[in-house]
Regions:
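Rossmann-like dinucleotide-binding cores of NAD(P)H-dependent redox enzymes
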Residues: 1-4, 110-112
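A conserved short coil-to-beta-strand element within the FAD-binding core of flavoproteins
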Residues: 3-16
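Glycine-rich beta-alpha junction loops
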Residues: 7, 34-42, 120, 126-130
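A structured beta-alpha segment of the ubiquitous adenosine-cofactor-binding alpha/beta core
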Residues: 20-28
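FAD-site-proximal beta/loop scaffold in flavoenzymes
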Residues: 31-94, 104-105
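FAD-binding beta-loop-beta segment adjacent to the flavin cofactor pocket
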Residues: 57-75, 126-146
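C-terminal auxiliary extensions adjacent to catalytic cores
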Residues: 133-178
Length: 178
């Protein structure tokens, strides 16, 4: 992992990744065996340039209630929010019920009692048929779903990622069923 570096080129024939240091603008050539690239993430301009945004441009929400820190009738979650956790489908799956419960409570004039703990999940592919399913909260405490040690590589977790999670996402989560 290279922090404060931007990937600008990949030379697959040489197995080299070219990065620019964001502080010094110096080029770094990094050899690799396998490379996993995450595109740069940032808030959309219509949020970044609005009064809803925090200093970094994300929707400024309370990390537990998901309610905006200035406008009480605004809530935020997922990729546009300032939540200090990974922007993953697993995270938003746990954020959505908290947001709904707290929004309904606000509409009824009740206290916001639902709380998001920062849960997120990161399936780490470790081989052609193995995976570690890392699940954790804001404090990086394990939040394992299954009754076994998920810090170990498992074929079953690979099968879950390959065959179960895609339909769960497309036919469950996106339709509010999971």
């Amino acid at each position: 992992t290279l922090f404060k570096h931007n990937l600008v080129e990949i030379r697959p024939e040489k197995k080299e990744a070219i990065f620019i240091n964001l502080d010094t603008q110096q080029e770094l050539v990094q050899p690799y065996d396998m490379i996993h690239v995450t595109p740069p993430m940032g808030p959309p301009d219509f949020i970044k340039n609005s009064p809803l945004a925090d200093s970094a441009g994300w929707v400024d929400v309370n990390k537990s209630t998901l309610q905006h820190n200035k406008y009480q009738n605004v809530f935020g979650l997922g990729d546009a929010s300032s939540l200090p956790t990974s922007k993953t489908g697993a995270a938003i799956r746990k954020q959505a019920p908290v947001l709904v419960k707290n929004l309904l409570s606000l509409m009824k004039g009740e206290a916001l009692t639902a709380s998001y703990d920062g849960y997120t999940s990161c399936p780490l592919v470790t081989g052609y048929d193995s995976l570690i399913l890392a699940e954790f909260d804001y404090d990086l405490n394990p939040q394992e779903t299954f009754p076994f040690d998920q810090s170990k590589e498992r074929y079953s977790m690979f099968l879950l990622k390959k065959y179960v999670l895609p339909p769960l996402y497309w036919h469950g989560m996106l339709r509010g069923r999971a």
